């Protein structure tokens, strides 16, 4: 069952769900709570790699990823990150999210931003039970104009569902959890996938 605004507020008050810094209650709407853009970004840098072999040997995949991803880019407050048409960038939410083992979260982009061509998450919008950390956003500008993205702007909304029971393998307890406690725009760790 998806939580309504009253339950989201109560779960935050009771510490069942945690968002740090906690958004004001006026950011809770119907069945969602707004989240803001953090200041950590990563982009694909200019490279000569013809492709990345996603099923190749782990060492080669790791080297290919390292050759195409930028280091972390920190955008100072008041400045903007410009996302150009046809460009993918990684960023984070300002808020760090912590979920218990019986709640799953969902991230949705804002309709107003989508109407300008901004995709906030390319495919990964599920926040696993037991998650703790910032949410990495996979931005894609499918529009015709560059978009100025500023830290602290409302970038999306989270909704939450209570599971039928407590997950046996919540994200926080998995040894293979590649993005546990992430606090920055972490690049793909597909090279760490199990065989």
Swiss-Prot record:
Residues 171-195 are annotated as: Disordered. DCTP binds at residues 110-115, 128, 136-138, 171, 178, 182. InterPro entries: dCTP_deaminase (IPR011962), dUTPase-like_sf (IPR036157), dUTPase_trimeric (IPR033704). Disulfide bonds: none annotated. Keywords: Hydrolase, Nucleotide metabolism, Nucleotide-binding. The keyword Hydrolase applies. It comes from the Bacteria. Catalyzes the deamination of dCTP to dUTP. This is dCTP deaminase. It comes from Haemophilus influenzae (strain ATCC 51907 / DSM 11121 / KW20 / Rd). The gene is dcd.
């Amino acid at each position: 069952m998806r939580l309504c605004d009253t339950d989201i507020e109560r779960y935050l008050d009771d510490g069942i769900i945690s968002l740090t810094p906690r958004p004001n209650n006026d950011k809770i709407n119907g069945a969602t709570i707004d989240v803001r853009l953090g200041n950590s970004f990563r982009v694909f840098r200019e490279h000569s790699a013809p492709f990345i072999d996603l099923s190749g040997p782990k060492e080669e995949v790791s080297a290919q990823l390292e050759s195409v991803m930028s280091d972390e880019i920190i955008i100072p407050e008041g400045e903007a990150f410009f996302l150009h048409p046809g460009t993918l960038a990684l960023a984070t939410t300002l808020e760090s999210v912590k979920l218990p083992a019986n709640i799953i979260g969902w991230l949705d982009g804002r309709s107003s931003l989508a109407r300008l061509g901004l995709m906030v998450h390319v495919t990964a919008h599920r926040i696993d039970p037991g998650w703790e950390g910032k949410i990495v956003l996979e931005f894609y500008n499918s529009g015709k104009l560059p978009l100025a993205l500023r830290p602290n702007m409302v970038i999306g909304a989270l909704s939450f569902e209570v599971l039928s029971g407590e997950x046996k393998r919540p994200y926080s307890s998995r040894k293979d959890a590649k993005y546990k406690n992430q606090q920055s725009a972490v690049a793909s760790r597909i090279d760490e996938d199990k065989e």
